[in-house]
Amino acid sequence: MDYSKTEETPINEEQGSTNSSESRSNEELFSDCDQQHSSIANEFGLTELPKDDKVYELIYRHCQSKLTSHLSNQFEIVSILKNGFQTPLGQAKLKAFQIYAESVAKKSGSCCGNKAAVAEAARVKYGCCGVEKEELKAILMYGFSNNALCLSPDNAPLQCMIDPSSSCNEDGISFLLFSRIIMGKSEVVCSTSQSYPSSMEFDSGVDSLTSPNKYIIWSTHMNTHVLPEFVVCIKTPSILKRKNPKSPWISFPVLINSISKFLNQSQIRLIHKHYKEHQDRRISRCELIQRLRSITGDSLLVQIIKSVGQKVHKDT
């Protein structure tokens, strides 16, 4: 789905949609946060989209339907920020992305035409990942820095919201980063240790060629083939409704312990190894999540998070 288009684009029924009246009913609830969101936008050098903006409405309907359909309204979208690439560095990043898209399109054997033709030939798609505030700031300023970048297709933002409370800032805001990605020719990636394409033939990795749940962009490509474009700011109702929030969340030790019941010994050892690396600050939280997803698969991970989260909620 191309969010950069401003025309009224209907959401595929299979992907889900939400009633616009829902956003209206939440308007009063979030009105006191407007100044805070503008502050975040200014801090990141982004522009906050007005709620009547067509791009805002498209992203809101699409993203809200995915979050609510899986997590029973545990998440609320409170603002959407856009990267306008207004600075000289931003302009350079945008131009570089366009040049690489044309290059990948030519490599596929397609003749470059207009932007739409280039995007189709280079298989430019949208992907998303959950990020912490400081990670987001670093990405927008300096780019991505992990060994590989694992993103979810834009029709499955739930996959990015693992361990949500640990990714919140002090105001309970989580950030979902939507980026344009040059996928080019993809290969199926099974090994968690693979950190670059198996050959020059490939531009990206996926967990499945037919129904991918993960887009994998290598460190050699992540700052040329990925363009951060939108930030969706999300807040949980439990935080909004309580003066001193104690919203249920899943810590990594609890999550790892629950997942271990379904994995073999080598997978468990690998997960504990990665968690130790995170504790020693050798890998970021974002990279730990990416490695965890690669080992367990998203389906199992989502089931565990929902199951444990419901138990924690009952206990509280």
From Swiss-Prot:
Transmembrane segments: none
Gene3D superfamilies assigned: 3.90.228.10
UniProt cross-references to Pfam families, sorted A to Z: RST (PF12174)
Signal peptide residue numbers: none
Keyword Nucleus attached: yes
Name assigned to this protein: Probable inactive poly [ADP-ribose] polymerase SRO4
Origin: domain of life: Eukaryota
Biased composition regions of type Low complexity, renumbered to the chain: 14-23
Origin species: Arabidopsis thaliana (Mouse-ear cress)
One biological process term in Gene Ontology: cellular response to hypoxia
GO cellular component, one term: nucleus
Keyword field: Developmental protein, Nucleus, Stress response
Domain called PARP catalytic: residue spans: 28-255
Organismal lineage: Eukaryota, Viridiplantae, Streptophyta, Embryophyta, Tracheophyta
